């Protein structure tokens, strides 16, 4: 059972807390994860349909790049990202309630918060991405900014901060704990990546056995959608566990000695 830390936790302890929070909150997050999987699957199917209509086989990287450069696909991809940002916020709201031992919010309530704050979420996401990309031109600043700004969604969906305020809140939360926070998030992303690669491997094996026909492609889509239901709540759980740990570190650092 997940409990907020009463003392600073090592990296492994925070990951363990994140896993506990993920498991405890999964039942509540599953409907939101299903919606996210539906959004991603719908986008994939539209890309496949467009490729077939244009006579572009999706058997090479070059063909795939050409399809994704089509204006309709680019517009649909932006729409997918915006919708997933709202669902990401809804997952944070739901998992934060679990971490605080609060009554279970209805799915519609969590979605309402996710979409109500979508405007400021998009602004914060764009600003943070621009800052990180510009910083990446000098390598080190980009790496630093990717860590120091990583908890802005928590500030926005837990503390109801604005777009700029959430970025500043993330900076203040992580300041002094950059290595710790970056390591936790890196481990969490590696776990999610490993799960995604495993699901892709299973889908590839099934498609190899079933062939490249409609049945094989349908099985791949089903496996991908099912994997997304489990995958989408992973990072929010890690971010909440990390935020709770870092806040505890700051409280102890500011306590009188």
Q: Where do the PLM segments sit?
A:
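Interfacial transmembrane-helix boundary/kink motif in multi-pass membrane proteins
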Residues: 29, 104-125, 169
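Nonpolar helix-loop interface/hinge motif
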Residues: 1-52, 142-212, 216, 250-252
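Residue-level signature of the transmembrane alpha-helical core
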Residues: 30, 34, 38, 78, ...
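Membrane-helix interface segments in multi-pass membrane proteins
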Residues: 40-81, 106-115, 136, 142, ...
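Low-complexity, intrinsically disordered, cysteine-poor segments enriched in small/polar
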Residues: 14-17, 21, 74, 113, ...
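Selective recognition of hydrophobic, aromatic-rich stretches within alpha-helical transmembrane segments
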Residues: 1-6, 66-102, 129-168, 215-250
């Amino acid at each position: 059972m997940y409990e907020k830390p009463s003392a600073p936790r090592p990296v492994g302890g925070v990951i363990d807390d994140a896993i506990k929070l993920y498991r405890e909150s999964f039942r509540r997050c599953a409907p939101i994860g299903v919606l996210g999987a539906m959004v991603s699957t719908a986008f994939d199917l539209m890309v496949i349909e467009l490729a077939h209509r244009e006579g572009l086989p999706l058997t090479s990287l070059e063909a795939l790049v050409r399809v994704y450069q089509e204006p309709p696909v680019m517009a649909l991809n932006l729409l997918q990202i915006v919708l997933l940002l709202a669902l990401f916020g809804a997952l944070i709201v739901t998992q934060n309630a679990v971490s605080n031992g609060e009554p279970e919010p209805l799915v519609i309530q969590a979605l309402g918060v996710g979409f109500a704050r979508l405007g400021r979420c998009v602004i914060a996401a764009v600003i943070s991405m621009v800052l990180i990309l510009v910083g990446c031109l000098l390598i080190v600043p980009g790496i630093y900014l990717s860590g120091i700004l990583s908890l802005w969604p928590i500030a926005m969906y837990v503390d109801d901060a604005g777009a700029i305020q959430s970025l500043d809140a993330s900076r203040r939360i992580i300041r002094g704990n950059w290595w710790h926070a970056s390591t936790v998030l890196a481990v969490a992303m590696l776990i999610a990546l490993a799960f995604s690669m495993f699901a892709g491997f299973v889908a590839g094996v099934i498609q190899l056995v079933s062939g490249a026909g409609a049945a094989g492609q349908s099985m791949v889509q089903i496996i991908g959608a099912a994997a997304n239901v489990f995958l989408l709540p992973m990072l929010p759980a890690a971010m909440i566990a990390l935020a709770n740990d870092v806040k505890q570190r700051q409280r102890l650092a500011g306590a009188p000695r």
